[in-house]
């Protein structure tokens, strides 16, 4: 899963950098990361954070900034964390990992989520399954 995630993340970030090549140091691309860092799925979340950091290191750009939030494997906490990221001016979020945590994300229409779930049916309109 790590290799797939790193490949996807690097490809996506390179596309962002090409599209936003005029970004200045003061105007970085902000990307949210919603993962479980506590609870039963904490190890998976930690691996995703590690893969994200490796991908950022491989990209070698200071134009990307990752904002990490622990969702506790809880749909309500996921929604709350997504709103917090939105308040920071973030409009693209990687995660959540599990389908159950997508439950309320359609309430935030102007955010796009790149979910790591393998389910593709009945996703909210603002969720892209990788």
Enumerate the predicted regions with their spans.
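Short, well-structured alpha-helical segments in soluble
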Residues: 75-91
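Extracytoplasmic ligand/sensor domains, especially the bilobed periplasmic-binding protein
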Residues: 92-130
């Amino acid at each position: 899963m790590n290799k797939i995630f790193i490949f996807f993340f690097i490809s996506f970030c390179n596309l962002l950098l090409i599209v936003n090549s005029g970004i200045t140091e003061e105007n970085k691309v902000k990307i949210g990361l919603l993962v479980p860092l506590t609870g039963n799925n904490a190890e998976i979340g930690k691996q995703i954070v590690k893969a994200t950091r490796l991908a950022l290191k491989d990209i070698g750009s200071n134009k990307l900034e990752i904002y990490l939030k622990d969702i506790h494997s809880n749909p309500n906490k996921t929604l709350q964390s997504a709103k917090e990221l939105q308040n920071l001016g973030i409009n693209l979020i990687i995660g959540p990992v599990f389908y159950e945590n997508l439950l309320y994300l359609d309430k935030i229409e102007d955010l796009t989520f790149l979910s790591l779930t393998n389910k593709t049916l009945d996703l909210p309109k603002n969720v892209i399954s990788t």
